[in-house]
Amino acid sequence: SPTHSYSTDDTFTVKLVNTSDLGCSDSLVKTVYVFPNPIADFSINDSQQCFNGNSFAFSNLTNINTGTMSYAWTFGDGNSSTTSSPSQSYASDDTFTVRLVVNSNLNCSDSAFKTTYVFPSPVLAFSINDSQQCFNGNQFIFTNGSAINTGSQTYYWDYGDGNSSTTSSPTYSYATDDTFTVKLVNTSDLGCTDSLVKTVYVFPNPIADFSINDSQQCFNGNSFAFTNLTNINSGSMNYVWTFGDGNSSTASSPSHAYASDDTFTVRLLVNSNLNCSDSAFKTTYVFPSPVPAFSIN
């Protein structure tokens, strides 16, 4: 009673011939069928992917000599598919075992296993102390709130004006007034990246200045004419003048006559339509005029 394993799939005729010790013989023939086995195999477009945008495409490379096949995929995360060459996106970062089970129409089967790696992607967040600031004294404080499930990450800040930083939570002052796009790019130790963009506004500051027709005048007939020399890159302005004697004006270029002789500090306060301000100060001198008097005998 022999045992035999066939090295190929096919249909074979098995013949048993029995011979007696007296030379009498007989034979019996039966047929055995060795069905073809599928040879399961598959490839992956990229077995190591970052979580953000992960998309695993599985190409079925299974073959069989004859017959048809059905497929059962399990992706290691509870999901499955019966298509020939499926795609799968994972909902979390982890290591997963992908299994392909192939069954032929004659109920012969084979399996193939491969591992996919979904690396954690950085989750970006940052805040700004104030995204709208006037040019004078502008200082933007960027507080990094980024996180990652496992591993480490590096930071790259692009301030939108040609300058950058690699610190975690930088502080930056702009050299011009404008609108800037700030971009934070984080890269994990496994090469996964993400970016976040926000806009900051540096409003133009007025540059306050003025001239005086004559800053030193005698009391009699004094008349100080103030010429407004303020400028701003863009926008409109309003003005508040204080003359140092309790009087004020909102005209652009006012005139003023003092009611007493003294030294006065004139202040021009300029506010833009975006609430940015600047001031200029100058001194006026009102000299006492003689008071003539004489008597006659």
PLM region spans:
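Extracellular/lumenal mature domains of secreted and surface-exposed proteins
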Residues: S1-N297
